[in-house]
Amino acid sequence: MSRLFKITALVPSLSRTRTQRELQNTYFTKLVPYENWFREQQRIQKAGGKIIKVELATGKQGTNAGLQ
């Protein structure tokens, strides 16, 4: 069973804007596997977004820190 992070993020949506001053934000929550976490984090930040919350969705807490 792989570890999954449940992330909540806010990304500006450029496709739905009618004027230059108006900016719509897309708010979403998704599950990201531990292996893809860094890539997903980079993607959100490059798009000008903000990561609001990160939780461990599955897997044992502290596994990566060597705790049993």
UniProtKB/Swiss-Prot annotation:
InterPro entries: Allophyco_linker (IPR011134), Allophyco_linker_chain (IPR011064), CpcD-like_dom (IPR008213). It comes from the Bacteria. Its main location: membrane. It is a peripheral membrane protein. Residues 2-57 form the CpcD-like domain. It holds the Pfam family CpcD. Keywords: Antenna complex, Membrane, Photosynthesis, Phycobilisome, Thylakoid. Gene3D superfamilies: Allophycocyanin linker chain (domain) (3.30.1490.170). It is found in: Cellular thylakoid membrane. GO terms for biological process: photosynthesis. The keyword Isomerase does not apply. One of its GO terms (cellular component) is phycobilisome. Rod linker protein, associated with allophycocyanin. Linker polypeptides determine the state of aggregation and the location of the disk-shaped phycobiliprotein units within the phycobilisome and modulate their spectroscopic properties in order to mediate a directed and optimal energy transfer. Belongs to the phycobilisome linker protein family. This is Phycobilisome 7.8 kDa linker polypeptide, allophycocyanin-associated, core. It comes from Nostoc sp. (strain PCC 7120 / SAG 25.82 / UTEX 2576). The gene is apcC.
